[in-house]
Amino acid sequence: MNLYRDVLRPLIFSGLRADPETVKVGLLRALEWLDATQATGILALLERLFCYRDPRLEVRLWGLTFPNPIGLAAGFDKDGLAVGVWPSLGFGFVEVGTVTPGPQPGNPKPRLFQLPQDRAALNHMGFNNQGAAALAERLRRLRQRPIPIGINLGKGKATPLEEAAADYLASFRLLRELGDYFVVNVSSPNTAGLRSLQAAEQLAPILATLQGENRGQKPLLVKIAPDLDWPEIDAILELAQAYRLAGLVATNTTLRRDNLKTRFLPGLGPLAAAAGGISGAPLRQRSTQVIRYIHQATQGQLPIIGVGGIFTLADAMEKLEAGASLLQVYTGWVYEGPSLVPRLLRGLAAARNPAPSSPERMPTGIQSGRKIVMDP
């Protein structure tokens, strides 16, 4: 029996009738306490339970060493409250944020909903965060950095779209010495107009501004939506080449509501009319399609962080085989619990030696047991 999946999750999702955001905040506060107190006995127990180390899983990318290819996606630990604890839960990297130049409360509550019938979540958070300065201060206090830390950058809600570049630049300047890689988030559906910044004519000045400041010192990526069509992705790939992006994160949440079993949300009404993005299992297939398209269109030359609907080893393998170099989990981790990461890693390590007759089935990130090296 899986204690989390069979006992704790049903209580959290239904038995306690708890607001999902309240539960998440409570977990983050507990992990923040662990980080602050460095309760070594508890941290050691977490490491024994959830860390799986195997040098065959190491990924070297952008001059960074990732102990394994499974990371925590942006949005869970926006303010880096537990950034020192995620390594003890087995993650190979963590992406904090989305962060904006100044603090902002986000959209009105309730704004996070679990959809258990669909193994999914609906969120309409709106970049709630304490601001770049607060995150910078927290990252400066880190005692050690055993895994790479990515920082996801966003535009403030009150900032006009035509001034978006200034917002991304302001946060980058505050945080550039503290992040190992940076992600430009122009794909969240929860800030009015933000997704329009994925259009080439809108995205180009943002990338020009950031890369002009960056001068190639930090890996810069863009996170894209799953709802883009192929010509729109092609335009972003042209910008990726023109502005020497280090990679893409594929994908953010989706606005699509088709094929969902959930129809109504208590206190909110019809799901079809609810604002926000869907994450989890319904996103798996489309995010993998986008990963495969990018990988093929760039002949495997543009690294991809694959995210969306990873619940099982098969899900993870699918994205690696499609062309992802690294993976991120969020909703799957909420549903499956902390045992998900070591379970995935054990499976990936076992999969590194396939039958000689089927080398094409090897995950891209661990082909033939070799470590990936993709430094520009």
Curated annotation (Swiss-Prot):
The EC category is oxidoreductase
Active site residues of this protein: 188
Can you tell which superkingdom this protein's organism belongs to? Bacteria
Q: InterPro entries of this UniProt entry?
A: Aldolase_TIM, DHO_dehydrogenase, Dihydroorotate_DH_2, Dihydroorotate_DH_cat, Dihydroorotate_DH_CS
Q: Which GO terms fall under biological process for this protein?
A: 'de novo' pyrimidine nucleobase biosynthetic process; 'de novo' UMP biosynthetic process
**Could you give the subunit structure recorded for this chain?**
Monomer.
What topology in the membrane does the UniProt record assign? Peripheral membrane protein
Binding-site list for FMN: 74-78, 98, 152, 185, 223, 251, 280, 309, 330-331
Q: Which cofactor does it need?
A: FMN
Please write the reaction equations for the catalytic activity of this protein.
(S)-dihydroorotate + a quinone = orotate + a quinol
Question: Is the keyword Ubl conjugation in the record?
Answer: no
MF-aspect GO terms: dihydroorotate dehydrogenase (quinone) activity
Region (Disordered) location: 352-376
Main location (coarse class): membrane
Q: Which family does it belong to?
A: Belongs to the dihydroorotate dehydrogenase family. Type 2 subfamily.
- Gene name for this UniProt entry: pyrD
Residues annotated as binding substrate are 78, 123-127, 185, 190, 252-253
Pathway assigned in UniProt: Pyrimidine metabolism; UMP biosynthesis via de novo pathway; orotate from (S)-dihydroorotate (quinone route): step 1/1
GO CC, sorted alphabetically, is: cytoplasm; plasma membrane
**Cofactor comment in the record?**
Binds 1 FMN per subunit.
Q: Which Pfam families match?
A: DHO_dh
User: Which subcellular locations apply to this protein?
Assistant: Cell membrane
Instruction: Give the function comment from the record.
Output: Catalyzes the conversion of dihydroorotate to orotate with quinone as electron acceptor.
**Name of the protein in question:** Dihydroorotate dehydrogenase (quinone)
